[in-house]
Amino acid sequence: MSIDESTAAKVAKLARIKVEDDALPALANEFNAILGFIEQLEEVDVEGVDPMVSVTPMALPRREDVVTDGDQQTRVLTNAPDAREGFFSVPKVVE
């Protein structure tokens, strides 16, 4: 698969990254280099290799699954810069 300048421009737009027209060829080349590396990774034989999520084997400690109300609301809200009616109060961020 090869990325041309128009596809690179589309990817930049979708990622909300402003890219000048004169930088599009370099961006397309970077994308092609990344895709080439991914194609190399696809050639690696991983048959029989267990998937890893960590470089060190870990087992999480188990505990009884007990439903509680937590009883921590007042302690948690004391750390809040602004709490109202038992909830965190934050500035509006979406119009």
UniProtKB/Swiss-Prot annotation:
It comes from the Bacteria. Pfam families: GatC. SUPFAM superfamilies: Glu-tRNAGln amidotransferase C subunit. InterPro entries: Asp/Glu-ADT_sf_sub_c (IPR036113), GatC (IPR003837). Its EC number is 6.3.5.-. GO terms for biological process: glutaminyl-tRNAGln biosynthesis via transamidation; regulation of translational fidelity; translation. It catalyses: L-glutamyl-tRNA(Gln) + L-glutamine + ATP + H2O = L-glutaminyl-tRNA(Gln) + L-glutamate + ADP + phosphate + H(+); L-aspartyl-tRNA(Asn) + L-glutamine + ATP + H2O = L-asparaginyl-tRNA(Asn) + L-glutamate + ADP + phosphate + 2 H(+). The keyword DNA damage does not apply. Keywords: ATP-binding, Ligase, Nucleotide-binding, Protein biosynthesis. GO terms for molecular function: asparaginyl-tRNA synthase (glutamine-hydrolyzing) activity; ATP binding; glutaminyl-tRNA synthase (glutamine-hydrolyzing) activity. Allows the formation of correctly charged Asn-tRNA(Asn) or Gln-tRNA(Gln) through the transamidation of misacylated Asp-tRNA(Asn) or Glu-tRNA(Gln) in organisms which lack either or both of asparaginyl-tRNA or glutaminyl-tRNA synthetases. The reaction takes place in the presence of glutamine and ATP through an activated phospho-Asp-tRNA(Asn) or phospho-Glu-tRNA(Gln). Belongs to the GatC family. This is Aspartyl/glutamyl-tRNA(Asn/Gln) amidotransferase subunit C. The lineage of its organism: Bacteria, Pseudomonadati, Pseudomonadota, Alphaproteobacteria, Rhodobacterales. The gene is gatC.
